[in-house]
Design a protein with these regions (language model features):
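A helix-coil-helix interface module used to build multimeric assemblies
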Residues: 1-192, 198, 204-209, 220, ...
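Generic, well-ordered alpha-helical scaffold segments in large soluble proteins
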Residues: 33, 37, 83, 87, ...
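A structural signal for small-residue-enriched, beta-sheet-centric alpha/beta enzyme cores
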Residues: 105, 208, 215, 219-223, ...
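Glycine-rich anion/phosphate-binding loop at the beta-strand->alpha-helix junction
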Residues: 175, 225-312
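Long, amphipathic alpha-helical stalk/connector segments used for oligomerization, subunit docking
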Residues: 296-367
Length: 395
């Protein structure tokens, strides 16, 4: 799933959620919910359901073997279902015929992806919330702290660090709202059977779908979405936007923390940010992680959009490509969110250096120009804006 280089750009939590064991466990949760729902409606014997449910425990399975065999099968679900049947047969051979009954591989895999994505989304929302709180606190504290406003990387006039902080926070607030709006539509149960009609469910497909969705805490679909990927991809697009907004914050921090600028610095701790042979340096590791995520997210999102035209009822290749692109996007989004949730609460702000940089610009300009564009009295406009925006964003 990940390389050694992916590891330090990610979080251990998200890597674990999308790990082999977690995905197999999520598919087993699908199979248990399926058997439970079908038995409750009389489609399969209760004794068979109990045998299946009791066997859907990831510790009973050789996950590494399932993953190895998936390459030959072309699907993670196929060797998983075979292994589940083999294991159920050890306890109740009559129940084997009811394992995975009436559904298809994509049902299990899409549902599993929704389950593990939900776990990581909760972490992303938590960490982005921490970042927003930190930024709004900084904005309130530094509403009146003068700062050079830079356009096209050049000093342009006076703003305040508070305005900068609300400018960082506002897109994150909007992203959280949009994520919460699109997530319920994306995090849906997948259940369509072989061609999406649930023909094997004896007319009880909608009831089974509702029971399973409630069991798993997912949204119940009105029909299968095997090749209707719009709501799923919409969630991916929102994650891409979030990563871009976090990357903008990180890029500003990197520029402001240069020795020549020295206006902010990431928090420091033993073993973090120190170079291999230059003890005088402190590298902005958290910002580096967020910038790396922002560099990679556009390609991931573009790939999700590219594979949306999926043929007929089930796709050969496009869906599989989507599966490969999805985890790295979500994982890097959480890596970025976690990094900024570390950096912003402990961000070191050097207001004296901010003032000194303004003085240096003023000294380099004719007095009339300096007084027009870099008079410290201009900060009152920024202060009012920062205070107003903090109140709006906290509302």
């Amino acid at each position: 799933m990940s390389s050694i280089f992916e590891g330090f750009l990610s979080s251990s939590d998200s890597l674990q959620s999308f790990g082999d064991r977690s995905l197999v466990q999520a598919m087993l949760r699908f199979e248990a919910a399926l058997a439970r729902a079908q038995a409750s409606l009389g489609l399969i014997p209760e004794s068979a359901a109990q045998s299946i449910i009791g066997t859907c425990k990831v510790e009973l399975f050789d996950t590494a073997k399932i993953v190895r065999e998936s390459a030959r099968a072309g699907s993670l679900a196929i060797p998983m279902v075979k292994s589940l049947k083999d294991t159920v047969a050890l306890f109740n051979s009559d129940a084997v015929a009811y394992v995975h009954w009436g559904c298809t591989s994509q049902d299990a895999i899409d549902t599993a992806m929704a389950l593990v994505t939900r776990e990581v989304l909760a972490l992303i929302e938590q960490d982005v919330g921490i970042t927003i709180d930190a930024l709004l606190a900084l904005a309130a504290t530094h509403a009146h702290t003068p700062l050079l406003a830079r356009t096209l990387m050049q000093p342009a006039s006076i703003t305040s660090f508070g305005v900068t902080c609300v400018g960082w926070a506002a897109p994150l607030v909007r992203s959280l709202k949009r994520l919460k709006a699109v997530s319920p539509n994306a995090l849906k149960l997948q259940l369509g059977g072989t061609v999406g009609t649930l023909s094997a469910m004896n007319g009880k497909g909608a009831q089974i779908s509702a029971l399973m969705a409630a069991d798993l805490g997912l949204t119940a679909p009105t029909m299968s979405w095997h090749t209707q990927r719009d709501e799923w991809v919409a969630l991916g697009c929102e994650l891409g936007l979030l990563v871009g907004s976090l990357g903008k914050i990180a890029k500003d921090i990197v520029l402001m923390s240069q020795f020549e600028v020295g206006e902010v610095a990431e928090p420091s701790e033993a073993g973090r940010g120190g170079p291999s042979n230059m003890p005088h340096k402190h590298n902005p590791v958290a910002s580096m992680i967020a910038i790396a995520a922002a560099q990679r997210a556009p390609q991931r999102v573009a790939a999700l959009l590219a594979v949306m035209p999926q043929e007929f009822e089930r796709s050969a290749g496009a869906w599989q490509a989507e599966l490969a692109e999805w985890p790295p996007l979500v994982i890097s989004a959480h890596g970025s969110a976690r990094a900024m949730a570390y950096a912003l609460p402990g961000l070191k702000v050097d207001s004296k250096r901010m003032a000194a940089n303004i003085d240096a610009v003023r000294a380099s300009l004719p007095k009339a120009v300096a007084n027009e564009w870099f008079d410290l009295g201009l900060v009152r406009h920024a202060e009012e804006l920062a205070q107003k925006q903090v109140a709006l964003l906290r509302a």
